[in-house]
């Protein structure tokens, strides 16, 4: 088996030359198809992505490789899922009558469609999100994040290699959401922003294995005028609990998913207890 693998790597340069000579049709060869899988060594995946880009194909594993960022190819939002979600929110409000603010966050492609080539199929999420808002009870506050983020689209509001918004993108929307909940937003000037990781690469990078796009920054916002101390109790899928004395999970910065630095690994329930003594509770779903 080892001998066969060695033979493959020795023949790889010849295979590269054949692909360059034969053009895109060679990409349908069974051997080429096997190179598309994530089970291949990382350097093979990097080589395959680079080759595709040389041949003009900037898509891989559902991700488009832009000039400055990676984008998950836009997918249509499920009308059934949106309708079911709206029904659950409405029912929760009817049972509790608690003040609620709902915000739907579009994907990055919604704001950077000019990064895609002309003629490429594109799914616009805005109409589906509008329909979702219309299905929510009129007594529930809604914040249309689309217009807020669109106004900030020249700034670093979405990660380049993760399918998420950045801390600044979230802060931009927070300013509107918190006002609708009856609070005064904390001014950006009151925060000190620290880069806890400057070479973060996320799921979009893992899907493409391309170094053509700069890595991301993982930031922490600290309010100097009112330092926050807290404990986080996490209930895991198996019912067990873990506790830490920080909102952040520093160990995650050394893993393949450094985004889990924020709040830690996915879990059904997390309870954050802070030093704020105002008698109020906030439920985030």
Spans of features found by a protein language model:
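Extracellular glycan-modifying ectodomains
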Residues: 1-285
């Amino acid at each position: 088996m080892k001998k066969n693998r060695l033979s493959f790597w020795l023949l790889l340069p010849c295979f590269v030359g054949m692909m360059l000579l034969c053009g895109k049709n060679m990409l349908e060869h069974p051997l080429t198809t096997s190179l598309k899988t994530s089970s291949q060594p990382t350097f093979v995946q990097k080589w395959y992505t680079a080759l595709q880009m040389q041949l003009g194909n900037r898509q891989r594993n559902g991700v488009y490789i832009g000039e400055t960022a990676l984008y998950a190819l836009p997918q249509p939002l499920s009308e059934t899922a949106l309708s079911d979600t709206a029904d659950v929110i409405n029912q929760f409000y009817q049972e509790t009558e608690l003040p609620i603010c709902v915000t739907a966050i579009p994907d990055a492609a919604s704001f950077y469609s000019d990064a895609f080539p002309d003629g490429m199929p594109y799914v616009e999420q805005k109409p589906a999100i509008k329909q979702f808002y219309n299905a929510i009870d009129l007594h529930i506050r809604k914040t249309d994040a689309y217009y807020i983020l669109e106004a900030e689209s020249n700034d670093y509001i979405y990660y380049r290699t993760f399918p998420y918004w950045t801390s600044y993108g979230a802060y931009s929307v927070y300013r509107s959401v918190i006002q609708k909940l009856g609070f005064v937003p904390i001014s950006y000037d009151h925060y000190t922003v620290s880069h806890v990781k400057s070479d973060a690469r996320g799921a979009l990078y893992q899907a493409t294995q391309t170094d053509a796009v700069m890595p991301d920054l993982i930031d922490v916002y600290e309010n100097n005028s009112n330092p926050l101390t807290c404990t986080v109790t996490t209930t895991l899928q198996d019912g067990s609990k873990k506790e830490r004395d920080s909102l952040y999970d520093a160990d995650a910065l050394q893993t393949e998913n450094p985004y889990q630095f924020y709040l830690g690994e996915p879990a059904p329930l997390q309870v954050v207890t802070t030093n704020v003594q105002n008698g109020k509770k906030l439920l985030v779903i």
